[in-house]
Every structure is written in structure tokens, then in C-alpha cells.
């Protein structure tokens, strides 16, 4: 349990290492045919943001978390594209590169968006590389 707490603490430290007045919080859901995750995001600026995600459908003693630092390389009113670097800990241990698009199709609900994300993940436990795709929802506060 101490090892898990240390890992979660490290991810939280990386997630909140930077602080800026223009910060904005968000919540998200990611899913595919294999698993799902829920996340909490924090925008440090218009370009840089971080997210902490927790995998669902796992026992509480075996919670898997992933944290990522992301960069919006295209940001428009109706969509954003981003790339990032992250790590996943516990059930799966490794690093990943997310590449995604967030689309806000409703003009009167700009805080709500749909997203798709492609992840390349290097899993240290299996010494293998995987390609995962996710879809989901995001709401910014």
C-alpha cells in the first residue's frame, strides 16, 4: 500500500508542479472496448495542461492511475489538438504518448467537448508497446 501511495503522490506532484492564475479545471471520461477511465485535468495556460486519470473496473486495492502533461499545438474555438507525455502506474507500469482532438460542437456549451485520443504506451512489465484508442467526454469549469 505504501508503494501505491508513493506512486500516486508522485503523479499528483507532477500534475500540480506548475501554477498559473489562468488555471482551469476539467473532468473527463475515456472509454474503449477494453476499459474506461475517469480524469481530472488542470490547465496551466492556453497551451499547457495536465490530467490525472484513474482506470475503472478494478478493485480498490489495485487502482491504476495515469498522469500526463499535454501541449495544445492547435487551439481554436471549436476544437483543440494536443500531444503529451505521461506515465501509468500499478496494474500497468509504463510511459505513454497521447495524441488527441477535443471538439466543442455546441456554441452555447463551449465548456463541453467530445474527444478522441490515440495512445502509444510502452509497458515495462511486458516489455511491449501497445496502441490504444479512446473516445470520451470532457467538461471544463
Regions found by a protein language model. Name each.
Residues 1-24:
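Cleavable N-terminal export/targeting peptides
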Residues 21-23, 47, 74-81, 106-112, ...:
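Short loop/turn motifs that connect adjacent beta-strands in outer-membrane beta-barrel proteins
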Residues 25-29, 48-52, 79-85, 97, ...:
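Transmembrane beta-strands of outer-membrane beta-barrel proteins
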Residues 32-38, 61-65, 79, 91-97, ...:
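Residues that define the transmembrane beta-barrel architecture of outer-membrane proteins
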Residues 34-36, 55-59, 72-76, 88-92, ...:
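Sequence/structural signature of outer-membrane beta-barrel proteins
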Residues 38-42, 67-71, 85-87, 97-103, ...:
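Residues on the lipid-exposed face of transmembrane beta-strands in outer-membrane beta-barrel proteins
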